[in-house]
Amino acid sequence: MKGYLKLEDGSIFEGELISKNKKGYGEVVFTTGMTGYQEAITDPSYAGQIVVMTYPLIGNYGINKYDFQSEKPHIRGFVVREYCDKPSNFQSEESLLSYLDNHNIPVLSGIDTRALTKKLRENGTMRGIITYNPEDNIEFDQTNLLEEVSTKKPYRIAGIGPKLAFIDLGTKKGILKMLNSVGFDIYVFPYNASYDDVMQINPDAIFLSNGPGDPKDAVDAIELTKHFIGMKPVLGICLGHQIIALALGCNTVKMKFGHRGANQPVKDLLTNKDYITSQNHGYAVEEESIDKDKITVTHINLNDGTVEGIMHKFLPVFSVQYHPEACPGPRDSTDIFDKFMDIVMVYKRRFYFAEV
């Protein structure tokens, strides 16, 4: 049946509603990956958003059991130029549409995604609605996205190495797998875990995950991070990067249209190397707010010059805006997990010998 994407500025894009669910509200964003739609729709960082795929043909390899980044999709809607209803892949177990229908996600096909993406680039991300009735009003909900995507109770992923307190702000499975693969004994905590909660395991290091929304809303995680800076090694990715920056006294700002996709170029200012990275964020650390006497900018985005990584000059604290674990995307910078392990082991040995 005929369907529409209506934006908050009144713009309407017409297409075909191909899903069982005919209505969905959310912030309309675009992602530029040619592949990786399964990872994108199950990435908790997309919670509360209607995702527009810029690549024109989506669904051609179906859905498999290996590429999920969480237990369910977190998007509010899915928009494509053309949907492939006959997937072909040896791992495919069901079609993309079948999967989204099973989770009540509205899907709009036949949209001029090129024109839509251009509009979002020029005017910024907007709230919108997928609907069968263009007269419908756009709703604005106040859902606590962190509560929606974070684990409800602590759990452990056993490893042979140092104990890592992992603050789940809406993590992707790929991050947990990478940290566990380098040896961390991971204890996962909810987004609102307290200092006392975390200290029950006496961790060797702290990790802050990716996640959705405005980093300034993550008040509990910011306060927790302040406690551990200078006390334990700390690493953050994506939202975790922004939270570390806020805990260090920096500011974050909402971007015009964000970075979403598996092809974002980043320069490592310490090594002068360039990487192609996977990203998914709508906020950035404001460079002007960084105290350069204490904090070094380690990475920048080559498209717009925004901050992609920071490191404290005197403390074992660093973070990156991009996703080094990829899922989907290039694995140019997976060595960050080994680097973190090295820092934690050095820090741990130093305190061991100090106690002896």
From Swiss-Prot:
Keywords: Amino-acid biosynthesis, Arginine biosynthesis, ATP-binding, Glutamine amidotransferase, Ligase, Nucleotide-binding, Pyrimidine biosynthesis. Gene3D superfamilies: 3.40.50.880, Carbamoyl-phosphate synthase small subunit, N-terminal domain. Belongs to the CarA family. It comes from Caldanaerobacter subterraneus subsp. tengcongensis (strain DSM 15242 / JCM 11007 / NBRC 100824 / MB4) (Thermoanaerobacter tengcongensis). It catalyses: hydrogencarbonate + L-glutamine + 2 ATP + H2O = carbamoyl phosphate + L-glutamate + 2 ADP + phosphate + 2 H(+). Residues 163-350 form the Glutamine amidotransferase type-1 domain. Residues 1-160 are annotated as: CPSase. Pfam families: CPSase_sm_chain, GATase. It is an enzyme of class 6 (ligase). GO terms for molecular function: ATP binding; carbamoyl-phosphate synthase (glutamine-hydrolyzing) activity; glutaminase activity. L-glutamine binds at S45, G211, G213, L239, Q242, N280, G282, Y283. Pathway: Amino-acid biosynthesis; L-arginine biosynthesis; carbamoyl phosphate from bicarbonate: step 1/1; Pyrimidine metabolism; UMP biosynthesis via de novo pathway; (S)-dihydroorotate from bicarbonate: step 1/3. SMART domains: CPSase_sm_chain (SM01097). This is Carbamoyl phosphate synthase small chain. Composed of two chains; the small (or glutamine) chain promotes the hydrolysis of glutamine to ammonia, which is used by the large (or ammonia) chain to synthesize carbamoyl phosphate. Tetramer of heterodimers (alpha,beta)4. The active site is at C238 (nucleophile), H323, E325.
